[in-house]
Amino acid sequence: MVLPKQNKKTKLILVSGPAGAGRTTAIRSLEDLGFEAIDNLPLDLVQSVLKPEKTSENIAIGLDTRGRDFSVEGLLDLLKVLSNLEHVDFELLYLSCTMEVLLRRYSETRRRHPLANGNSPHEGIEKELMLLEPIRNKADILIETSDLTPHDLKASCLLYTSPSPRDRG
């Protein structure tokens, strides 16, 4: 007996959050969990990755405010488009972190915050948190990373991206 091939939906996880909250760690963790991982993909290319004939079963895409065409409005528009794709189930994963921890992480790496414009990291972080607030409000999954180690973040990604709610604990 031959069974017809099931049309499986692509599971898409969009990962966003302020710089320093763990987006790259989350993307790498999702890759370790079997997702095709793409970090810093421009918003205008997301749909091309999701063509039914080319799509992987599980895809994780990191979205960075520093991206070439990133805008909050653009991402919110993309979410509307994705919700109409019958072959894709998507979730928006937002990584949150306290100002204190973000400042500490920046001082440890001695990197300039991308939105600081030569000013203090605090100013850049404040700008980014305000910019990302509408995205945070749309998140399906919110992970507070302030007290998480990279291993803990990977475990959280596993918990929240399991195939079914029953597997999520």
Regions found by a protein language model. Give the residues of each.
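Conserved nucleotide-sensing/catalytic segment adjacent to the nucleotide-binding pocket
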Residues: 49-80
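Short glycine-/polar-rich loops that comprise or flank the Walker A/P-loop
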Residues: 56-57, 86-91, 137-140
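Phosphate-binding beta-loop-alpha motif at adenosine-nucleotide cofactor sites
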Residues: 139-149
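Extreme N-terminal, non-catalytic leader segments
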Residues: 2-8, 50
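Switch/connector loops and helix/strand junctions flanking conserved nucleotide-binding motifs
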Residues: 70, 99-106, 132, 151-152
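Conserved phosphate-donor/acceptor-positioning beta-strand/loop module used by diverse small-molecule
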Residues: 88-106, 144
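Conserved substrate/cofactor phosphate-moiety recognition/catalytic segment
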Residues: 16-59
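Single conserved hydrophobic/aromatic residue that forms the stacking wall/gate
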Residues: 160-169
